[in-house]
Amino acid sequence: MNKDRVALIIGTDIATNGFESGAALRLGSIKHLLEDTGFKTSVASRKTAKSFLKSDWDLVVLISFSTSSLLRHARRRSKMLWFDPTDSWTLTRLSLLFSADIKQAFILIRDLFFLWTSPKIDLITFISERDSNKERLWWGKRSLPLILSIDGLDREVKPSKYPRLVFSGDGRYRPNQRALKFLSKTSKFLPPDLQIHLIGRGIRNTSKNFKVHGYLSHQDMYFANDIHLAPMKHGGGLKLKVAVPLWNGLHVISTPEGSSGFKKSPRLKIASTPRNFAEQISEILREGNQGEVAKPRHEIYLRHDEAEVRLWLRSFA
């Protein structure tokens, strides 16, 4: 009888705190992939990782650039090492730094040190090809990264006869704050009775055209005929604000930045300015009720190397 292969996944505190987030979704999808290919998995946060790394593992997976300080320790305790930065360290850190988040300068230097001094890494994955290409400087002499997009996006879409404009996100996050300012400007080009529904923690009502719902579980977030708005201007990765509604067959309007990594789709509209956003909203509203929602699923991504990752996982005993 073959001995069970054991894997340890190390994620950020946000990814392991039990709340739904992009980081938690990423960790969950990698955990599912490991279990589906025959691994018994354990999960640790950065804070608890060292106690888990007192044992030996067949595979250790580190998710996020902020776990890079554990690469050397993980290498000593595992047969194989998988590093999933997820999105581009350069795009994410620099965009926050340019937003006057000064502490990002220190985090940037810290992560850079651990990246350049890291040991051999057997598999590197990113969430999109764009993110991978932005980090070519440090992985160029290592293994060629694979692209592992977002899974686990199935959501219940409840029936509704009426369209809603929807923005979801944490209001404490700077890119979301900028997006809300963008939408406040967008609302000036819309009919005065047309509201934008805001879903998420920490969102303040800054416009008479906004309706704030606070945090909602994903069972109550998605309705047929919703139009999801994602005016993101900075950062890396695939935007969940785009991925989740698009995966589930809903209309999305986003910027060139927010739509990066996704295929062209009749349900994904691109706009760069508040006026353009309002024009795209009006165009979708003129089309009327979209009827039964068709779910395109993996067809939304430009590239998804899950089959190659599965093959790699099955290649060692």
Region locations from a protein language model:
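Conserved catalytic-core segment of nucleotide-activated headgroup transferases in glycan assembly
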Residues: 14-33, 145-208, 212-223
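A charged, aromatic-enriched C-terminal amphipathic alpha-helix characteristic of glycosyltransferases
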Residues: 22, 275, 286-317
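Short N-terminal targeting/anchoring amphipathic segment
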Residues: 52-69, 82, 123
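Active-site proximal beta-strand in glycosyltransferases
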Residues: 75-94
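Membrane-proximal helix-turn-helix segments that form the acceptor-binding/catalytic region
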Residues: 89-91, 102-124
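Donor nucleotide-sugar binding/catalytic pocket of nucleotide-sugar-dependent glycosyltransferases
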Residues: 115, 119-155
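Acidic donor-binding loop of glycosyltransferase active sites
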Residues: 223-237, 248-250
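Short hydrophobic beta-strand element within catalytic cores of glycosyltransferases
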Residues: 241-244, 251-255
